[in-house]
């Protein structure tokens, strides 16, 4: 009985750790606009380097809900679109040194993806990740 309880605890901890570790190469799919998280509800965004997902630009958006009954949600997004959006916002703001460095890093990423743009690097359908499914949500409480 103790080993069963221990296995259950390990399984629960593994699920929590998997939720916290980015699994960036995931299937990007179109969402109904009512399901797209508000920019104000996003806690962090993980954008891949070109070599991470075989040249495909993927961004994983993490939305943790504040209410106890609401679960955490991951959404796989087109990384190039996320980069372009963030750059458009940053270009309109006065930037401090850290934000300026962030903007330059985004420009570097954007240029890297542009230099490798082709049929193989514009589709993330080849990635079959459970975190690319909007329906897969979990409570971390």
UniProtKB/Swiss-Prot annotation:
Disulfide bonds: none annotated. It is found in: Virion membrane; Host cell membrane; Host Golgi apparatus, Host trans-Golgi network. Residues 1-19 form the signal peptide. Keywords: Fusion of virus membrane with host cell membrane, Fusion of virus membrane with host membrane, Glycoprotein, Host cell membrane, Host Golgi apparatus, Host membrane, Membrane, Signal, Viral envelope protein, Viral penetration into host cytoplasm, Virion, Virus entry into host cell. One of its GO terms (cellular component) is virion membrane. Its main location: virion. GO terms for biological process: fusion of virus membrane with host plasma membrane; symbiont entry into host cell. Residues 21-131 are annotated as: Interaction with gH. It is a peripheral membrane protein. Pfam families: Phage_glycop_gL. The keyword Metal-binding does not apply. InterPro entries: Herpes_gL_rhadinovirus, Herpes_gL_rhadinovirus_sf, HSV_GL_alphagamma. Belongs to the herpesviridae glycoprotein L family. The heterodimer glycoprotein H-glycoprotein L is required for the fusion of viral and plasma membranes leading to virus entry into the host cell. Acts as a functional inhibitor of gH and maintains gH in an inhibited form. Upon binding to host integrins, gL dissociates from gH leading to activation of the viral fusion glycoproteins gB and gH. Interacts with glycoprotein H (gH); this interaction is necessary for the correct processing and cell surface expression of gH. The heterodimer gH/gL seems to interact with gB trimers during fusion. This is Envelope glycoprotein L. It comes from Saimiriine herpesvirus 2 (strain 11). The gene is gL.
